Amino acid sequence: MKYFLWSAVTIFAIVNVVGAKNSDFDPRCLRACTAIYRPVCGFDGKQYRIFASECVMAFENCNLLLKSQKAFQKTLMSFCQVEEDFDSDFCPEVCPLLYKPVCGSYGDIKKIFPNECELKRANCKFGEAWEKINMDICRNISFKSELIDPKKKCLKPCNLNWDPICAFDGEKYFTFGNRCDMEIQTCLRSEKNWTLIRKGEC
């Protein structure tokens, strides 16, 4: 999960040829994109989706158009938060930088998520089973008990560099955008910490 605090930073671009290792994409769409994480929100008329950058969205749109499918149009990042009326099969790769807390229940554990997208991502990406419940329930629980407030305990500034690392939780491997992102996700999880396996994608 990525909670980046926007700041004015100078980052040197690293060129990455998008699609070069993926045989599912048409070679006519290969392009050099910087490996800097600057997310944009796209909408294809049915679903919202977050792309790592405008360049990556353009690359995927190229492949969609060659297959006579509808391309994504750039829209406001705030639209990419997962709402209840979204497609239930949609699993966000990254969530918007929005603090609109929701209360989640996982068995006897209650936990505050920064937004509904993060709750959904915990379920579909990490195999958890959080259920959204009334926010008052989380507010009424003492923070000294099992309640976790990620805004206070887990969120911290992360840079926008795409410096992927491969992590393992004992069951599955997962690629995080950088080490800071992995540390936040480990903090937010109620079970099974992520362990760094190596630098680079899994």
From Swiss-Prot:
Domain named Kazal-like: residues: 23-77, 85-140, 148-202
Domain of life the protein comes from: Eukaryota
InterPro entries noted in UniProt: Kazal_dom, Kazal_dom_sf, Prot_Inhib_GrowthFact_Antg
Signal peptide: 1-20
Residue positions the entry lists as glycosylated: N140, N193
Site positions (Reactive bond): A35, I36, L97, L98, L160, N161
Cysteine pairings via disulfide bonds: C29-C62, C33-C55, C91-C124, C95-C117, C103-C138, C154-C187, C158-C180, C166-C202
GO cellular component: extracellular region
Pfam families reported in the protein's UniProt record: Kazal_1, Kazal_2
GO molecular function: serine-type endopeptidase inhibitor activity
Physiological role: May act as a serine protease inhibitor, since it possess the kazal serine protease inhibitor signature. The recombinant peptide does not produce toxic effects on insects.
Miscellaneous note of the record: The peptide presented here consists of a single Kazal domain but is suggested to be derived from a multidomain Kazal protein after proteolytic cleavage.
Family matches, as PANTHER family: FOLLISTATIN, ISOFORM A-RELATED, FOLLISTATIN-RELATED
Protein name: U-Kazal-Dg21.2
Organism whose genome encodes this protein: Dolopus genitalis (Giant Australian assassin fly)
Lineage of producing organism: Eukaryota, Metazoa, Ecdysozoa, Arthropoda, Hexapoda
